[in-house]
Amino acid sequence: RMTVYVDIDERSASFFALGLAKASGRPVALVCTSGTALANYYPAVLEAETSRVPLIVLSGDRPPHLQGLGAPQTCDQVKAYSDHVRRFIQMPLAEGAPRAVAFARQAARELVLSALPGGSDTCEGAVVASRACSRMAGPVHANFPFDEPLKPDFSVSGVFSAGRSALDGADGLAGSAGLAGPELAAESRLSAATCDQVKGLIRGRCALVLAGEGTCESLEEAREMAAWAKAYDLPLLADPLSGLRSLSDDGVIDNYDNVFGHDDFPVPEVVIRFGRYPVSKRCVQKLAAKRPIEIVVDAGETRDFNAMTDLFVACSPIDFARSLLACAGDARASEEFFSAWCEANAAEHSRILSVEEDSRERVTGKAANGAEVVGDAEPESAAVAPRPEGAYVREILKATPAGSCLFSANSMAIRAIDTFYVKGDKPLAVLCNRGLNGIDGTVSTALGVAQHFEQTTFLTGDFTLQHDLGGLALQREIAQVAAERGKPAPSIVVVLLNNNGGGIFEMLPQASDEPYFARLFSAPQD
């Protein structure tokens, strides 16, 4: 059964669809008319491309004989998204000929296969978002020209069955039950030669794992990944979007951003990076300065803007770990280096808790025991800034139910989560639009993500909320669709960090250029 949402704002609709696909891992279709309508989808298409989210854009168009002649709502829509989509198909004029219907069905298959090139199944029980988004999924576009009369005639016999495969719904055909969608590709395994090469690089060396967005897609995978890393004495530096901070294992390093804030941080000789670089800019810069050997594990591309890739392994992180475990031969990294990272992480954990308390005192004027606080206390560590967001984020995380979703805006919101989301709190799905790191359509994306969870908490700053305030109008449509399905609408709690823009631009060199900075960069809201 297909669920249909109607939204009058194409930009908001596109990010809502992005959120639906991001959370479920299934392709979501975006339908629009011609003209500026599909142009409003462009930002979401760019985010889907860089975040590897399966999005199918179906645009209506005017017929060929009206193109280039000034006809209303008519522009050149052929390859409108250029190379930002995985596949573009220009459809013929709609007609009922069997060959045209067969082409349309084949085009639908091609679009789905291109949106999910890893072969993810589209039927019930399909793989979840992080798997789909780790196998080079992405947006696709089909453009449909229509001529008048535009009203379809649904009374035509066989309009929905024409051109179907003989295996669709056939009874008694061997294996037909499993042909509802593309078959799921088998897991990839490393060759023995690659396993030996990787093991040779990490054996006895100071090595660590940098786990980026979408490293693990379930709690079971996270446990498996942590066990593998510990068996190899590899500190597992866990980005907040990696799926690993639900664990409390000693080898899971959640405070690595603050560890890198000290000059004496444990310097690696080898880094194994899973997927995208982490949120922490300090981590990326410090590692680039030290230039260790870097092994990049990713299903499709290096995503290496620092040009540090020494060895690229094309597979998913979990298949990488399983392959190494299956290969014979010991390859433990330096045990002393592993212990050094665990100790440094534990020390930063206690400092973060003290900064959290300092933030709470600044916000409430009271200590945890209720005592009044006079004056500002100095932070214990220069690596951690005592911003008020810390106390808020910790309280939000404590109140967020286990198994629910925490969707974060970019800018200061995701950085606050990176600092104050302490490992082992509870299993959460933490998501964010990190493809282009922008604030566009964030409210709408959060609402789309929320349709996949019973409870979603959305953390955002004031700039981001204002930028997509119109997305809140979707709530009426969401409630109506839920009522039609006889189900309650999913719950979403919006937490606003009303922090006058968050101050992230104050970190730029231009911050010292007054009066231009306040007018052109910080754009204060007060």
Model-derived features: positions:
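A short, small-residue-rich loop immediately preceding and capping a beta-strand
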Residues: T3-V4, A23-R62, V267-G275, E454-H467, ...
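Active-site nucleophile and cofactor-binding loops and adjacent substrate-binding regions
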Residues: V4-F15, L30-A37, F407-N410, V430-V443, ...
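Glycine-rich, anion-gripping cofactor-binding loops and their flanking helix/strand elements
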Residues: N40, A211-I295, D425-Q455, Q466-A473
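Conformationally flexible catalytic loops at phosphate/diphosphate-handling active centers
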Residues: E110, S114-G204
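Acidic-glycine-rich active-site phosphate/pyrophosphate-binding loop
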Residues: R1, A17-A21, N410-A429
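Glycine-rich, acidic loop regions that bind phosphate or pyrophosphate groups
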Residues: S59-R109, G118-C123, V127, D239-H349, ...
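Thiamine diphosphate
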Residues: L58, H65-S82, I89, Y421-D526
